[in-house]
Regions:
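Append "Primarily bacterial transcriptional regulators
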Residues: 11, 30-35, 43, 82
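HTH DNA-binding helix-turn interface
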Residues: 20-24, 37-54
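Short, basic, alpha-helical segments at the C-terminal edge of helix-turn-helix-like DNA-binding modules
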Residues: 28-29, 58-69
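Hydrophobic alpha-helical connector segments
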Residues: 66-91, 98
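Amphipathic alpha-helical packing segments from all-alpha helical-bundle domains
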Residues: 97-140, 163-166, 170
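C-terminal peripheral helix-coil segments that are non-catalytic and often amphipathic
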Residues: 147-186
Length: 186
C-alpha cells in the first residue's frame, strides 16, 4: 500500500473516531492530526479541509458499490453501508453549505438516479428536474432515517425508498402525459 494511502487512511480513521464523540463542526484539522500523530502539513498535502476528507472517506468506502454495473439494484447495500457507519454519516450529513457531504452525496447519486429514470420525458430539463427532485428527497429521507433514535433495518429503508421513487415517478409520468395530451387537443 502506498505511503499516501496509509496517511489518508490514518487521517480518515482519526476523523471517524473523533466524530463518534463530537460534531464535525467542533473538530479541527489540528484535532485530526493530533489523534493520529501527524502534522497539519501532511493533512493539507492530501486534503483541502476536513470536508474534503469526509468526501474522500465516502468515495473510498462507497466506490465498490457505486462502480459495479448492477449498482442500481443494490440500493439495499447502500442503506447497509450507511447504517453500518451511521454515527459517522449522521454527523457528516448535518453539515450544510460549501463543501458539505450532503451536497457531495447528492451529486454522487444523481448519475445513478438519471440512469434509473432514463428517458421518461422528451425534455432534458424535465428529466434533470426529476433527478434533482429524487436526489433531494433521497438525501432528506436518509438524514431522517439515520437521525432516528431506532432506525429501521437497512433492507426496510431500501424497500421504502424504492417503492416511493417508483410511485413518484409513475405519478409524474402519468401527469405529464395527461398534460401533453390536453395541450395537443387545444
Amino acid at each position: 500500500m502506498p505511503d499516501s494511502l496509509i496517511t489518508k487512511r490514518a487521517l480518515a480513521s482519526s476523523l471517524k473516531e473523533l466524530m463518534k464523540t463530537q460534531p464535525l463542526t467542533k473538530i479541527s484539522v489540528g484535532d485530526i492530526c493530533e489523534k493520529c500523530g501527524m502534522n497539519r502539513k501532511s493533512f493539507y498535502y492530501h486534503f483541502c479541509d476536513k470536508y474534503d476528507l469526509v468526501n474522500w472517506i465516502f468515495d473510498t468506502e462507497f466506490s465498490e458499490i457505486r462502480n459495479r454495473p448492477d449498482h442500481i439494484t443494490k440500493f439495499e447495500e447502500i442503506c447497509e453501508y450507511f447504517y453500518a457507519d451511521r454515527e459517522f454519516y449522521r454527523n457528516a450529513l448535518q453539515i450544510t453549505g460549501q463543501n458539505s457531504f450532503r451536497d457531495y452525496f447528492r451529486m454522487q447519486i444523481q448519475p445513478i438516479l438519471k440512469e434509473l429514470v432514463g428517458n421518461l420525458f422528451d425534455s432534458e430539463e424535465d428529466t434533470e428536474f426529476l433527478v434533482t427532485f429524487l436526489a433531494d428527497g433521497m438525501v432528506s429521507a436518509l438524514i431522517r432515517w439515520l437521525n432516528g433514535s431506532d432506525p429501521e433495518p437497512p433492507e426496510e429503508m431500501a424497500r421504502r425508498v424504492r417503492r416511493t421513487m417508483v410511485a413518484i415517478s409513475q405519478a409524474i409520468v402519468t401527469t405529464y402525459e395527461e398534460e401533453e395530451s390536453k395541450a395537443g387537443k387545444e
